[in-house]
Amino acid sequence: MSNGNRRLFIMIDEKFIREAADAYLREHGYESIKLKAAMFDMDGVLFDSMRNHAKSWHETMAHFGMDLPEWEAYMHEGRTGAGTINIVSMRERGHEATKEEIADIYAYKSDLFNKCPKAERMPWAYELLQKVKASGVVPMVVTGSGQKTLLERLNRNFPDVFQQDLMVTAFDVKYGKPNPEPYLMGMEKYKAFVRKCGGTAADATVCADGVSHHTSEALAFHSGGECAPWR
């Protein structure tokens, strides 16, 4: 994509975001939205890595006698590895995978993924994160990834942006996306961060990307705030 086309894309996207935000303010009678934190997914948002994940999942499941088409892997974006494995196992075999099977399958998939071409960071992602941080909004990561080198990889590609106590990974959650648990965990980590810095954490409005109506309601209920589904 040329720089000119990228600028046009950003302008169009910014116009859409402003219109959606204005409509939300009118609907709820608010004067403005004061963002305190922004939660970013990693694969497909910060890194252009979904094609590698899709290929690795497809080949891994075939190796273990199950079928997961590459296109379907995109539908499981954000899930924990165990969550994806159990969905396929239930469909293909009629039962969930054992803990030992999950460990073996995920290790095989991780090995294939690590052999794929290096996934570059998304165009303009670093510039966006710098702008977010400069505006006083706290950038966070909420990902289903269980990579042990996650923080090092983020710091190498996005220096001086993220910190470990403001990250939610597969190691922090039981259910994973699309369950609201990772976002709720992110809100709790943000509140703990604010308290550590000597501040107070007020109720939040959650802007949820691509979540279902029921997930939106769950986020709003458990957070004590509101949830604006972002589609």
Ranges and model annotations:
Residues A62-F64, V88-R93, Y126-M140, G144-K174, ...:
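Substrate-recognition/cap helix-loop segment adjacent to the acidic, metal-dependent catalytic center
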Residues I12-E72:
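Active-site neighborhood of HAD-like aspartate-dependent phosphohydrolases
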Residues S56, T84, T149-E152, S216:
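Phosphate- and divalent-cation-binding pockets in alpha/beta enzyme and binding domains
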Residues S2-I10:
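Short, Lys/Arg-enriched N-terminal segments with co-localized hydrophobic residues
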Residues Y24-K34, N114-V141, K148:
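Short, acidic loop-to-helix structural element flanking the phosphoryl-transfer center
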